[in-house]
């Protein structure tokens, strides 16, 4: 079966993720299926690169089917994920006459998705939106779960909202135009799901044949791992939408990932690459605390590296590490919380990690 | 009894409005009662005028009780209810170290409340906040119901979120420092509740003695009408939080009110004054459609005027009226919807009002 559907069960905010090669070419049909009627205005938010690849065809498909659609492009890059870009979207929304019954579609990677979802959360106090992620990272992570927002000059994602999409459509075909390095970065999050909850996925990724087929972007294999990743994410998010508890485990590798992104300058490492290094650090801490086995830490390292991900910790000043960690919004009541593995497929949340325990890994 | 509590029943978002003269002097006690522990940071958002009157005492009460509190002032006036002011609040939030467990308190009128509620909705994807309205308008209207947001250069409240407060505290004593004209403007919303749902309140307001006591700001009388107003609002909001149906009746008088605010220049009429004129226009349309009696329209006019509110329609170009009405976000699928009275205490929503029917009232 080439089409997969994954339910994200969140009461009256539940929605489905539809995963199918080529789905982008039949977008109007999919919209009609989920009850988007043709009298509703659609604002498609994308960026130049994605728009050059799929924009015209996508928009034409909507217009040929009598949808009243318009596309607005935002600049690519983390530095444009800010209030100014949001403000530009509001201007277009006003000019286009986006009303309470209209809908926003995010067509692009994580930045497009996050900004679009937040625009939808806040235009006229909230209108519906749909995620169509085009990068591996956004397919397995940000497009599902409703975290939306923009950056504050002092920190990533400080401004935002929990806002679940009405639907998510994923077309693995779009990965064929994704730079190899970004594909690898997305694999870091896939491997993360393996470590935190899905031993079978981890083992699947270790198998040489699967690895080759994935790197060659075979749809069947891509669908398998995307499906598994989203299933895990859906399961966790449905238990704890607003990250008051278990959802935090999705941040495995992220605290140190943010440290690395911040201190090495945004852009040196891609998000997924920083997460890969962060997972390695978290693993080392777990060893120090006697939680995990060295053999499994080594398996994690080998798997990350086999998908061309970095694991070596860059040179970073210890004091800077502490400053960033303390400023991280995952701190609660002044206590730093870390997600540490106990075995492949199981992690837990710890707030009793001594600074000295992780600072030794930095120079 | 001098203390009133009104429940706003919204499932796990339910909260209480506490109404008591002098409650501002015991704010720490009230916070502790609703479970705000002293380790939580509190950012108080206010404006200069309110801060000059109550700010120091308020902050000292918090600090004397070992709360970690800070106050930030925003500029008064509709033109500062924008993304830039919001951005300044985010900067203070960052510097103060506002975390997920922190809380925002809005101390002031409707603008302070709307901006604060939206800041709370969007800082770290949402933290808790408390409304302490200090104007009659915000006590009976904007502090309850969770509508928060800022203006877009092209229109009021286009950017925002539904975000219910954790609690609302109302101290009628603060009305003693409110300019007479603003008190009257607030009375327009109180009278509105009479017309849309509460015939008893309407009759109460008509009684000469009550009117005099209200104008003299007698707490007992103020508490009576604020309590009645909030009860009606609470009842309606709990049926339809996101204004997909019945909540729209709270906008009685507002469509034409917005037209008047827009076209006469913001500032010429206060919001409540524009609503008063809007209610008179809505009443006239109801007469034209044969829904309402001329006697009751006259009673509405006399009541509004007896609280020093304007009812006469200013000179406005017909075409401009249409432009503003069509741009109003209450338009759904291109249809204009009007709230029209059938009798004092009962209104309904109509989407079949011919343009000619109301344009005749404009010159």
Curated annotation (Swiss-Prot), chains A, B:
The keyword NAD applies. Zn(2+) binds at residues 189, 254, 271. InterPro entries: Dehydroquinate_synthase (IPR050071), DHQ_synth_AroB (IPR016037), DHQ_synth_fam (IPR030963), DHQS/DOIS_N (IPR030960), DHQS_C (IPR056179). Its cofactor is Co(2+); Zn(2+); NAD(+). NAD(+) binds at residues 134-135, 147, 156. One of its GO terms (cellular component) is cytoplasm. Pathway: Metabolic intermediate biosynthesis; chorismate biosynthesis; chorismate from D-erythrose 4-phosphate and phosphoenolpyruvate: step 2/7. GO terms for biological process: amino acid biosynthetic process; aromatic amino acid family biosynthetic process; chorismate biosynthetic process. It catalyses: 7-phospho-2-dehydro-3-deoxy-D-arabino-heptonate = 3-dehydroquinate + phosphate. This is 3-dehydroquinate synthase. It comes from Prochlorococcus marinus (strain MIT 9301). The gene is aroB.
């Amino acid at each position: 079966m080439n089409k997969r559907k994954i339910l994200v069960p969140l009461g009256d905010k539940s929605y489905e993720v539809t995963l199918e090669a080529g789905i982008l070419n039949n977008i109007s049909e999919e919209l009609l299926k989920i009850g988007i009627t043709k009298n509703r205005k659609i604002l498609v938010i994308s960026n130049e690169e994605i728009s050059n690849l799929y924009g015209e065809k996508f928009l034409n498909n909507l217009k040929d089917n009598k949808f009243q659609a318009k596309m607005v492009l935002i600049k690519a890059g983390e530095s444009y994920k800010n209030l100014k870009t949001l403000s530009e979207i509001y201007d277009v929304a006003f000019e286009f006459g986006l009303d309470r019954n209209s809908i926003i579609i995010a067509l692009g990677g994580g930045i497009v998705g996050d900004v679009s979802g937040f625009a939808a959360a806040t235009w006229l106090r909230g209108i519906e939106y749909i995620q169509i992620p085009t990068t591996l990272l956004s397919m397995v992570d940000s497009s599902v779960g409703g975290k939306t927002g923009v950056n504050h000059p002092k920190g990533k994602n400080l401004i935002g909202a929990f806002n679940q999409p009405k639907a998510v459509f994923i077309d693995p075909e779009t990965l064929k135009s994704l730079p190899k390095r970004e594909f690898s970065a997305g694999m870091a999050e896939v491997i993360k799901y393996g470590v935190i909850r899905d031993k079978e996925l981890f083992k699947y990724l270790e198998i040489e044949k699967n690895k080759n087929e994935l790197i060659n972007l075979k749809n069947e294999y891509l669908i398998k791992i995307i499906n598994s990743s989203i299933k895990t994410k859906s399961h966790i998010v449905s238990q704890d939408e607003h990250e008051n508890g278990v959802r935090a485990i999705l941040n495995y590798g992220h605290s140190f990932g943010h440290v690395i992104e911040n201190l090495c300058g945004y852009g040196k490492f891609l998000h997924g690459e920083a997460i890969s290094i962060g997972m390695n650090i978290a693993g080392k801490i777990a060893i120090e605390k006697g939680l995990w086995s060295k053999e499994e830490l080594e398996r994690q390292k080998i798997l990350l590296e086999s998908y061309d991900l970095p694991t070596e910790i860059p040179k970073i000043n210890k004091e800077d590490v502490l400053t960033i960690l303390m400023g991280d919004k995952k701190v609660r009541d002044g206590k730093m919380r870390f997600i540490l593995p106990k075995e492949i497929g199981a992690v837990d949340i710890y707030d009793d990690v001594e600074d000295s325990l992780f600072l030794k890994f930095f120079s």
